[in-house]
Amino acid sequence: MANNSPALTGNSQPQHQAAAAVTQQQQQCGGGGGATKPAVSGKQGNVLPLWGNEKTMNLNPMILTNILSSPYFKVQLYELKTYHEVVDEIYFKVTHVEPWEKGSRKTAGQTGMCGGVRGVGTGGIVSTAFCLLYKLFTLKLTRKQVMGLITHTDSPYIRALGFMYIRYTQPPTDLWDWFESFLDDEEDLDVKAGGGCVMTIGEMLRSFLTKLEWFSTLFPRIPVPVQKNIDQQIKTRPRKIKKDGKEGIEEIDRHVERRRSRSPRRSLSPRRSPRRSRSRSHHREGHGSSSFDRELEREKERQRLEREAKEREKERRRSRSIDRGLDRRRSRSRERHRSRSRSRDRKGDRRDRDREREKENERGRRRDRDYDKERGSDRERDRERSRERSKEQRSRGDGEEKKHKEDKEDRRHRDDKKESKKKHSRSRSRERKHRSRSRNAGKRSRSRSKDKSSRHKNESKEKANKRSRSGSQGRTGSVEKRKREHSPSREKSRKRSRSQDRSHKREHNDSKDQSDRQDHQSSQSGEPESQEKEHKSKDETV
């Protein structure tokens, strides 16, 4: 009930000039029926408020999901953008107002309006009527558009969908104000899929107000106080019984005249009523039976003419509907042809543009290919040059490396030869030096021993001579001794011995220096064999 509060203030008594005209027509109809309630005057806005869920239109979820998933709603109705296009679609496509198409729901032999199932129960193929009803809801109709639906004169199904739109979207407190002036509407329509359930607009509206069920779905619930109020008001408005005889014919004629008028504002054409004829006939009864018979014949003739006029009117209506359908189809075909021609022209222009673009793209691609080819050829040339250079450099480098290796090997052979020669020369020099040293050492030892022995002998001799001659000779012996000692032979021998000692010392020092140098070189070169040989030679010398 929270959703009802904003709608109650803004939409208390909806009315329209067309509805007022319809009520005036019903009031003008004579005989039997109760008087309709006049429309309440008042200003109301054109914006029509919605009641309940503003996204689902208060439809059953199963029906709504089938509507949204149907290809008819997604493809064909999506192209319809205006109110008039949807109304034309209703005129050509709707043949019943049941939510499901015939034979699409399996109710397992259940009978009745709902098939023994409350709500939806089982799904099926949703009808075009409910798809178009939800399409109207997506357009957010105004008050004027809704009144145009419920007062439409071309098809009763347009009016039926308008009333169903009101039942689903308007507050329950406003339903009586919407439906009151149409409760006695006698226009027939077949509401069941496949036919077989003909009812009038008034009967359909009474079922909308008193019952929640509509075939295999449910309308939005009406609050209990509002429902009681509606029931009481319906009791005060009983159904009109169809009249027999001339008055029934007159009622049908007036209904036809009302249907004939496109807008409800048009005044009804004045016709001769059967009441007037009856009053005139009673007034003329006193003149005789002949006048009464004449009057009766005239009345029969008038009824026959009226029937013929009705048949003509029906034929005209059929021809008009056919002509309208043809005109609409022709206009649509013309529009389609124009749109197709325009689309063809546009497509031709687009094709030309696309061709030009493709040509330009091809030119650009050719240029790019040529440029790429040139760049590729240049790159290949550069690569070949670089390869040749690298090959030359590699060949040069290989030759240089070979030469360098050969030079290194030659140097190594030379160094090895030199070292071997040096080793042989060193070994020979060492052997020679060793031999010379050994010889010199023998000579020195021999010379030293000889000198010592000679000196010892000389000293012993001198001592003996001194002892023997000390007493006899005296000073002469001493002088001679001095002379002998200072003789040149003695001095020469002494000098020789001293020079030999000096030379022997020098040779010994030279040999030591050479041996030290050789040891130093051998330690630096790291040759263990030479070191062992030198050690052996040193040991031998030692």
UniProtKB/Swiss-Prot annotation:
Pfam families: PRP38. The modification N-acetylalanine is found at residue 2. The modification N6-acetyllysine is found at residue 228. Residues 1-41, 233-542 are annotated as: Disordered. GO terms for cellular component: spliceosomal complex. Keywords: Acetylation, Coiled coil, mRNA processing, mRNA splicing, Nucleus, Phosphoprotein, Spliceosome. Residues 244-256, 292-328, 346-419, 448-465, 478-491, 498-520, 530-542 have a biased composition (Basic and acidic residues). It comes from the Eukaryota. The modification Phosphoserine is found at residues 5, 289, 291, 319, 321, 445, 470, 472, 478, 523, 525, 530. Residues 293-322 form a coiled coil. Its main location: nucleus. Residues 13-28 have a biased composition (Low complexity). GO terms for biological process: mRNA processing; RNA splicing. It is found in: Nucleus. PANTHER family: PRE-MRNA-SPLICING FACTOR 38A-RELATED (PTHR23142). Belongs to the PRP38 family. May be required for pre-mRNA splicing. This is Pre-mRNA-splicing factor 38B. It comes from Mus musculus.
